[in-house]
Amino acid sequence: MTFMAKLLMLSLLLLGISACGLAQSCIPLEVQPFDYTLDVHGTRYAGTAVVSPVPGEPVYELTAEGYTGVREDAERIYALLGHAGEAMEEKHINREYTHSYIIGTKYVHFSPACLLYGADLEKLDQFNRAGAWISGLHDTYTDVYRGYQLPWREIPLIAQTDFGARVEETFAILDSMGIAFGEPEAVAYWDVFAMQSEYDRSQFDQEPHTFEEADAILEIQMPTYLNGMRLKAAGMGTSDASLNDCRTSIRVRMTQQQIMEIDAGDCRFKAPQQQRGGEPIPPEQALAQYEQYLNQMLVLEEGTTEITSILLEYDVWLRYTAGVFSPTYHFYPVWSIYTTRSCDQPAMMIHALDGTEVIW
């Protein structure tokens, strides 16, 4: 082999190594289907993770015991609404939180919790007709928060509603519990039914969006969130944990991996992505970390003064289910209230539907 040929081979080898380092595609992420179990405070989640082919982003469907699946649930809803037999197209409006199924021009948004926890399906059609109201509220607040990050008192739509009064009410609750979170930097409205941030924006400007209208819709939805709900809390930030009633959906930032998404009902497991020069974390290890993270997060120690939204909501829910207090209002996390110190520490998220004084 001539000197020039050897030099060419060496150049190609170095080029290949460089490309591998840049693209990080030389470390294959190949995970076979596997059985999984998660034990969280006495509740056992079990099933099988199967590969779902998503180019460039390995995603695994976690099948849960006793759950029929989202598509089967959608077909039952279609039959209920008189659309049995029509062509069904699946569309993920927000892949982490929502499944939107479309029949023709008719939108039907729902949560699998409706069927899993026995909500009144006959009211879904009513929700479908009125859904633009709450969706509009959600879009407005999240757009303002993400786009401008204004202090909540400076957001025009808040000034036109009783939103500010309800925020002040929340701080009164926190103060009575001896918990100080500081002044919120900004506020985001969460659609408690399905996180529909991209829901049919053509309807957004066609309907009036008031809290009275949103409350009327939420009165329909509340049975979904009060039947069988163990915990419902949400946080926004770089380190994010969101526990939902039917789908224990956790997004955690860990060492050597990007945000991992795991569900325990309508389940997908997003395989951990490798970091620069790092080995991908095996799913079994990620699940073990997730299980440990869950158990640590949900433990509320006596005398805790720095309480995150997860711990606070869990404490409130335990008191509610244990009959320690019987409020005359419905509560659920609908506002995300952030302190000036950190956007990762949301305060209590609560809302009185009937306008009664919120005290326990």
Residue ranges and their predicted role:
Residues 110, 126-127, 132-136, 231-263, ...:
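A short, surface-exposed beta-strand/turn
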Residues 27, 320-360:
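Activation/maturation switch segments at domain boundaries
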Residues 20-240:
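Preferential activation on post-signal-peptide N-terminal prodomains/segments
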Residues 1-31:
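Gram-positive cell-envelope targeting signals
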Residues 169-174, 178-331, 336-339:
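Segments that shape or occlude catalytic/ligand-binding pockets
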Residues 162, 282-283, 351:
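Helix N-cap and loop-to-helix transition residues
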Residues 48-71, 271-288, 343-347:
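Short, exposed beta-strand "edge-strand" segments with a Pro/Gly-rich flavor and a Y/T-containing core
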